Amino acid sequence: MTQSYLINTQTKTAVIPIMRNASSMLEFVLKKDGWVITKDRYPSADFTYYTVWRDPYERLISALQRELCEVYDQNLHRTHAAVDAQMNEWSNDPQSIVDLNHTISQYDTCIDIVPQNKKLIVYPYAQISSMLFAATGKLHNDTPKMNVSADYPPPIVELWQEGSVYTREPLWMSGWCRKEFSKDYDVWERLLKADTLSIIETY
């Protein structure tokens, strides 16, 4: 299913969020300026497409942390045990991670939206404000705070504290992540090597 994204039909511009918290933030900022949310696969071949890209491993962990928050909320009488059980389940069956709503490949998300042979302008996740300026021509100083892991419940924060079993090298599931999201890594590594703030991908 095509993920929702934002378009401005007057400027023929589209912005593709690649994470749930980024999606909420972009909707908050752009809907005030006449942008609309759509799931139309190809609104127009003459749109200019923008997105931000995140380190695939950091994005995976961020998505799993949000999933763990739901586990926590549903098991308040046994939070540590429930969180540990979920981590063990993912460790033993990594493919179950792929079926989660927010772990879809960034590449797959974009290729499902951007028309064939159309260019996508990609910024690093840390440059989301620069991407917004490029897409809108406006500075946005009213962006809401993005979700940060420090705000999560203690049992989830503890999993990723320095020295835990999940933060030791090699990082938990990092090899599987690189294999499963290899195309995401290809784009991310091109961004890291670029001498410009953004790169252009063609699908």
Region spans (language model):
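Short, charged/polar micro-motifs that form catalytic or ligand-binding hotspots
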Residues: 15-16, 20, 122
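Extended, structured, electrostatic nucleic-acid-contact surfaces
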Residues: 4-17
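Catalytic nucleophile-elbow at a beta strand-turn-alpha helix junction centered on a G-D-S/GDSL motif
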Residues: 18-30, 55-58
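PAPS-dependent sulfotransferase catalytic domain
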Residues: 4-7, 36-53, 57-202
